[in-house]
């Protein structure tokens, strides 16, 4: 029976490389998958999932008003798995569509993304995945300053920590860093 998986981690925890690994494992056995990502994330191009170690693949971009359920249901070949990158940017309706893919089409969905933003608020997509997912797993990484488990994301602008501003600002290593709680409140900058 298919399930909805939510795998979250801070920046630089290996979420995208995990997607690419899972896709490779399915495809190596001749089982097609669908890789999707938020249309908001254009760091490496529109509709591209890209890991920090250099691996990348094309993906289907998801807009907030996309009917994901209908898109998957109308594919000529039923996928063995749907893999979602940057799931924190999904809308509530996107997440409910993913649950329908699992429940009505019996296709497993694995959604990967951040849980909380730089202000320690849940993203809309993360909130609804936490509510609806059958299985929730944390992908761990370490604090940039002390090597404890990183649980938060620190936004850095002009060499200084930022705790206010727009929730969504697409960036990479130069803007966001994984930190533990202690170094979120007292970064060693």
Swiss-Prot record:
EC id: 2.7.1.21
Main location: cytoplasm
Gene Ontology CC annotations of this record: cytosol
Catalyzed chemical reaction(s): thymidine + ATP = dTMP + ADP + H(+)
InterPro entries given in the database record: P-loop_NTPase, Thymidine_kinase, Thymidine_kinase_CS
Binding positions (ATP): 9-16, 85-88
Catalytic site positions: 86 (proton acceptor)
One biological process term in Gene Ontology: DNA biosynthetic process
Subcellular location: Cytoplasm
TM helices/strands, residue ranges: none
Leading EC class: transferase
UniProt keyword annotation of Kinase present: yes
UniProt GO MF annotations: ATP binding; thymidine kinase activity; zinc ion binding
Gene3D superfamilies listed in its UniProt record: 3.30.60.20, P-loop containing nucleotide triphosphate hydrolases (3.40.50.300)
Sequence similarity: Belongs to the thymidine kinase family.
Subunit structure: Homotetramer.
Protein name: Thymidine kinase
């Amino acid at each position: 029976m298919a399930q909805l998986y939510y795998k979250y981690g801070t920046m630089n925890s290996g979420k995208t490389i995990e997607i690419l690994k899972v896709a490779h494992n399915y495809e190596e056995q001749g089982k097609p998958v669908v890789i999707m990502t938020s249309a908001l994330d254009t760091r490496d191009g529109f509709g591209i999932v890209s890991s920090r170690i250099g691996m990348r693949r094309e993906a289907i971009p998801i807009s907030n008003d996309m009917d994901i359920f209908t898109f998957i249901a109308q594919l000529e070949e039923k996928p063995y798995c749907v893999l979602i990158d940057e799931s924190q940017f999904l809308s509530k309706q996107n997440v409910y569509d993913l649950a329908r893919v699992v429940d009505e089409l019996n296709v497993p969905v694995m959604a990967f993304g951040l849980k909380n933003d730089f202000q320690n608020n849940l993203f809309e997509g993360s909130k609804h995945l936490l509510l609806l997912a059958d299985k929730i797993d944390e992908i761990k990484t370490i604090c940039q300053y002390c090597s404890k488990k990183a649980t938060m994301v620190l936004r850095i602008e002009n060499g200084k920590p930022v705790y206010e501003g727009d929730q969504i600002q697409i960036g990479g290593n130069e803007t966001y860093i994984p930190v533990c709680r202690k170094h979120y409140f007292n970064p060693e900058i």
